[in-house]
């Protein structure tokens, strides 16, 4: 099947997802370390705001280094809580708390985050990621 929005390699139809489902899909793909599929969830450019730093990226794969994360002890991440703050036809604001976990399921990082999503022809896309505090995705 090759209709727009259908991705047979993942079996997901992005355009039918709600903003909250898009955030859950982000975590699933992050846990799979699937950089190409992660790139499809993000708008271009997208913005990462952590602590007092604001950065601009053209793709998610430009921002993340999964080997760096594995070397830091990361095995997978999980959403602890999630809440929709706002949604209209064009934008959505989702806040959530998440953890990074080790192979033994020990929590090695926890943070509050907010995703600003925008509606595009292919579905909801993450435009801005706000992290309350510091967070690293790579050595850069």
Specify the residue positions occupied by each region the protein language model found.
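A short local loop/turn or secondary-structure capping micro-motif enriched for an aromatic residue
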Residues: 57, 101-104, 134-137
